[in-house]
UniProtKB/Swiss-Prot annotation:
Entry GO terms, CC: cytoplasm; cytosol
Similarity comment: Belongs to the NDRG family.
Name of the featured protein: Protein NDRG4-A
Alphabetical keyword list: Cytoplasm
Presence of the UniProt keyword Glycoprotein in the record: no
Comp. bias (Polar residues): 370-390
Source organism superkingdom: Eukaryota
Gene Ontology BP term (one): signal transduction
Native species: Xenopus laevis
Amino acid sequence: MKLLGHKIELWAGLLLPDVSISGMSELRFPEEKPLLRGQDTEMESADTFLSAADTDWKEHDIETPYGMLHVVIRGTPKGNRPAILTYHDVGLNHKLCFNTFFNYEDMQEITKHFVVCHVDAPGQQVGASQFPQGYQYPTMDQLAAMLPSVMQHFGFQSIIAIGVGAGAYVLAKFALIFPELVEGMVLINIDPNGKGWIDWAASKISGLASSLPETVLSHLFSQEELMNNTELVQNYRQQISNCVNQSNLQLFWNMYNSRRDLEMSRPGTAPNAKTLRAPVMLVVGDNAPAEECVVECNSKLDPTNTTFLKMADSGGLPQVTQPGKLTEAFKYFLQGMGYMPSASMTRLARSRTASLTSASSVDGSRPRPCTQSESSDGIGQINHTMEVSC
């Protein structure tokens, strides 16, 4: 995507405007020093991301119109604040998908302000019983329609949704059906497109040529990651094979590959266009198999309330490989929504010079609030999609 025009410098938390051409923007963070601690270690052991820091979580099985949902929750609703609700990708569960991210040290500054609710897709949690033969797995639309039962059970008034892959699709569908229940969204590796007969046939052929775990791995990781057979890939191969019921996984995989198009359109591009109304942060690794799909999703969203985060040196699971960068971006996102105004941003502000280059599409009448670091007097407002490379 070609980015032109307007440039803004971010240094020590200050935005210094230059010339302007409205539109799409890109924010780059040159690496003067590693943002993540321990970057020489690719990932914790499999045991760590499956079991660490689980003592504060409480498990629930919640009845919904389309079957039972396994949910784990930490904390209690805090006044009128939304809950952070997550939904994992196909082949994973909440532990495999989110433990590394939510156990990251700097995330604790966020989670102490919100109740956190992880939803496992039916039959995908660790130790799940196998569904009986002939069981009809819920459609992707039905998976989205199960979530109001979760919110009602815990008394959530609204949510900030974090979804990855298939989970991002489910949460986007939920937000389209129940926009009043969603305050903000972080959508990682989302594919907004439906699967046609050609896609279905290709996935069938691929499935015949390889085992289910290998097929799922090709969805989660880039070809480069798979060819290098990194420690991360080896860990996930083992966990997908041993910690997720394979029969249940096959049902979820089949349903995800039968999904319909989300049918979103950027406002003003089509009569009666519908899109996500809440602020959205799209996230994808620059080496992820979903990169093109996320770029396409960005073209379907309202540019006045969308941030596009493209993470450098990150493959298919940025929440696992780059939890520090994603945590910091999530803090900015929450601050833009008016939450956590005093949260510390000093590490990013002190260690980086960022340039914001814009060029784009639609003039927005609603300003997108930017965040302030502890060292800044003020930051300007941005009225267009912001693409962030870090």
